[in-house]
A protein has these predicted regions:
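Bacterial Sec-dependent N-terminal signal peptides
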Residues: 1-23, 195
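Generic hydrophobic-segment detector
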Residues: 7, 68-69, 193, 205
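Generic low-complexity, intrinsically disordered sequence content enriched
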Residues: 9-17, 35, 48, 57, ...
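Aromatic-patch recognition
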Residues: 22-177
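C-terminal partner/receptor-binding element of secreted or periplasmic proteins
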Residues: 165-205
Length: 205
């Protein structure tokens, strides 16, 4: 049932009618709900068939699409949020679906990488997406989740890998979902499909 719901969720994304698109250029604007809009058609489309989450911007005006790819921090389209991964220089130059969590954080799924590769606009060229990388991105069960949040001390957006312990903290007020989650095999608890559907069932995202 879980896999079916996820399939429906992502399979319908490309066929969503031309929906209202709005965006923020900074994380603070996102937290303060200060959105901007552009005239004309602006929508998100699948970036690569081998990547189940990656999305790219399409617009009537090429300069609008180029601007959004470069400067937009978060885009809201079709009732969903999409985080721009470009600034991280780690996960590829794409937008991915994201979920707001804990008020000031965003959850998203991507390939599992070492924390040492978490670079934010520091000159790192990131991880090249090879064919094998694309194969690992084709299914949610091959991905893990991350949290993006603003670091006021460094004044930059930072990310952290979502571990089973972090998921358990988010489920602290939801004993039924927490109990079901803790009964899963340890190897499954950090899979993106498990994390996302568990948090959705608890109403956390």
């Amino acid at each position: 049932m879980r896999q079916f719901l996820l399939f429906i969720l992502f399979a319908l994304l490309p066929f969503t009618a031309i929906a209202q698109c709005r965006y923020t250029n900074t994380w603070q604007d996102f937290l303060n709900d200060n959105w901007k809009t552009e005239e004309g058609r602006v929508e998100l489309v699948p970036s690569a068939k081998e990547d189940c989450l990656a999305m790219d911007v399409e617009a009537d005006k090429k300069k609008t699409a180029k601007m959004l790819r470069k400067t937009a921090c978060v885009i809201e389209w079709g009732g969903s949020l999409y985080l721009n991964l470009r600034p991280f220089n780690t996960f590829g130059d794409v937008f991915v679906q994201a979920w707001r969590i804990g008020g000031d954080k965003v959850l998203f799924a991507r390939q599992d990488v070492a924390p040492s590769r978490f670079s934010i606009a520091n000159g790192d060229t990131g991880i090249p997406l090879s064919r094998s990388s694309f194969r690992s991105l084709s299914k949610l069960e091959n991905l893990v989740c991350y949290l993006a949040a603003w670091d006021p001390q460094r004044e930059e957006l930072r990310i952290a890998r979502v571990t089973a312990a972090i998921v358990a903290k988010f489920l602290a007020g939801h004993p039924a979902q927490l109990s079901q989650y803790q009964q899963l095999e340890r190897g499954q608890r950090e899979q993106a499909d498990i994390v996302i559907t568990t948090l959705q069932a608890a109403g956390v995202i």
